[in-house]
């Protein structure tokens, strides 16, 4: 059975009200996204450090899903009128029903990070039995190895991590970097995320990979410093978290930062150079990674 997907661009004053109204009048689902997602103007909002707790993007997309025979246009008209909106433009497309599990699995093949490091979904055979294989399935938390920022951090761990070092993965998402660190020789690794779902996903993924990783919400992170601190998040929280991440890094320890665009590397480098001697930025597909040693 096909579905109707409707996308409406609105401002921050009405996005949540419109999503609620669409659900009340029959939408199967309604989601709110940054209208500028994937561009330089993308904003880190929900739950990001340094951002107000109650805030939404100034320009948002409300994406609603309807059944094949639902009167989507009428529902949108009713919902927009309730929200005080008139003649609101929207776009629509048909989404074909599929075997979503099989489709999802077909889109995720093993990913080769380096000669010795692979990421392999659980439904695939391990491509290189002698390699370090991370068993990781796509889920609700960010980090499957397909994004350039994740790959940049994995490549650093693969080539620079020393046996027995302690690692803090701040903004751990799926826990991929925490797990990789342990499989690559770290003596101790901790993942931290503001999202409870990510913390649960990290624990599940660590169990699947037979590694003893610990995962916490920020308030639960024990005191202490680490040999290596990795933060693969967005530029705005990286700006806000510099002093804290530096404090968590041992003197002579190293930091690895990603989640920033190419053009943001110079600015972030200026901030973190207060505490670290930084190497030149490494880039991949428009994204950057900074790394350096704490003075």
Curated annotation (Swiss-Prot):
Reactions catalysed, as given in the entry: L-lysyl-[protein] + 3 S-adenosyl-L-methionine = N(6),N(6),N(6)-trimethyl-L-lysyl-[protein] + 3 S-adenosyl-L-homocysteine + 3 H(+)
Signal peptide coordinates: none
Keywords: Cytoplasm, Methyltransferase, S-adenosyl-L-methionine, Transferase
Pfam family for this entry, one: PrmA
SUPFAM superfamilies: S-adenosyl-L-methionine-dependent methyltransferases (SSF53335)
Gene3D superfamilies registered for this protein in UniProt: Vaccinia Virus protein VP39
Keyword Methyltransferase among record annotations: yes
GO cellular component: cytosol
Chief location of this protein within or outside the cell: cytoplasm
Binding, S-adenosyl-L-methionine: 150, 171, 193, 232
Annotated GO biological process: methylation
Coiled-coil annotated residue ranges, if any: none
EC number(s) per entry: 2.1.1.-
Protein family membership: Belongs to the methyltransferase superfamily. PrmA family.
HAMAP family found in the cross-reference section: Methyltr_PrmA
Protein purpose: Methylates ribosomal protein L11.
The name this protein goes by in its record: Ribosomal protein L11 methyltransferase
Higher taxonomy: Bacteria, Pseudomonadati, Pseudomonadota, Betaproteobacteria, Neisseriales
């Amino acid at each position: 059975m096909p579905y109707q997907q409707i996308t409406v661009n609105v401002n921050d004053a009405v996005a949540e009200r419109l999503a609620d109204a669409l659900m009340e009048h029959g939408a199967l689902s309604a989601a709110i996204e940054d209208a500028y997602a994937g561009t330089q103007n993308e904003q880190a909002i929900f739950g990001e450090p340094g951002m107000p707790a109650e805030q939404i993007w100034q320009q948002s997309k409300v994406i609603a899903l309807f059944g094949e025979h639902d009167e989507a246009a009428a529902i949108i008209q009713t919902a927009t009128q309730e929200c005080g909106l008139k003649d609101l433009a929207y776009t629509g497309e048909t989404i074909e029903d599929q075997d979503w599990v099989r489709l999802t699995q077909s889109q995720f093949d093993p990913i080769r990070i380096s000669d010795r490091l692979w990421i392999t979904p659980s439904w695939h055979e391990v491509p290189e039995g002698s390699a370090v294989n991370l068993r990781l399935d796509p889920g609700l938390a960010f980090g499957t190895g397909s994004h350039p920022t994740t790959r940049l951090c994995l490549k650093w761990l693969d080539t620079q991590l020393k046996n027995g070092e302690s690692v803090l993965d701040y903004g751990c998402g799926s826990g991929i970097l925490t797990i990789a660190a342990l499989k690559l020789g770290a003596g101790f690794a901790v993942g931290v995320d503001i999202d409870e779902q990510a913390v649960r996903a990290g624990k599940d993924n660590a169990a699947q990979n037979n590694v003893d990783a610990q995962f916490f919400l920020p308030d639960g992170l024990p005191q202490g410093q680490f040999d290596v601190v990795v933060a693969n998040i967005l530029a705005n929280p990286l700006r806000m978290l510099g002093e804290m991440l530096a404090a968590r890094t041992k003197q002579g320890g190293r930091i690895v930062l990603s989640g920033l665009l190419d053009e943001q590397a110079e600015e972030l480098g200026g901030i973190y150079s207060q505490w670290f001697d930084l190497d030149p930025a490494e880039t991949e597909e428009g994204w950057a990674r900074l790394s350096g040693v704490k003075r």
